[in-house]
């Protein structure tokens, strides 16, 4: 019985981890389609750091956490607050996967 419970727990952990892992190719498409590129620049490299920070290469989870913080109101910004509301958790994970590799 313990073996079955252990195997079930391991399967749940693996399944939840893969659900959080984003698709970089889909993330690139979303990054462009949702307009992120307009402020944060090609591949997440901003042309105006004072207004729009670069968000490339920050590591896995950075962008997803930032989007979640803007959605919840933990972080506020008149531009990012409304933009974050249009991004699902799955889309954020995809965008995150794309930008983490840039």
Pin down the residues of each PLM region.
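Axial heme c-ligation environment in periplasmic c-type cytochrome domains
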Residues: 48-54, 68-102
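The canonical Cys-X-X-Cys-His
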Residues: 35-42, 95
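Acidic/polar helix N-cap motif
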Residues: 23, 59, 88-91
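Electrostatic cytochrome c docking/interface patches
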Residues: 15-32, 46-51, 69
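Classic N-terminal secretory signal peptides
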Residues: 1-20
């Amino acid at each position: 019985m313990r073996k079955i419970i252990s195997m079930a727990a391991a399967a749940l952990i693996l399944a939840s981890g893969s659900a959080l892992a984003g698709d970089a190719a889909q993330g690139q498409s979303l990054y462009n389609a949702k307009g992120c590129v307009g402020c944060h620049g090609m591949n997440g490299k901003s042309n105006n750091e004072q207004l729009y920070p670069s968000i490339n290469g920050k590591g896995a989870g950075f962008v997803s956490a930032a989007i979640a913080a803007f959605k919840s109101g933990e972080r506020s910004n008149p531009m990012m607050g409304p933009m974050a509301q249009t991004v699902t958790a799955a889309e954020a994970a995809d965008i995150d996967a794309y930008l983490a590799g840039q």
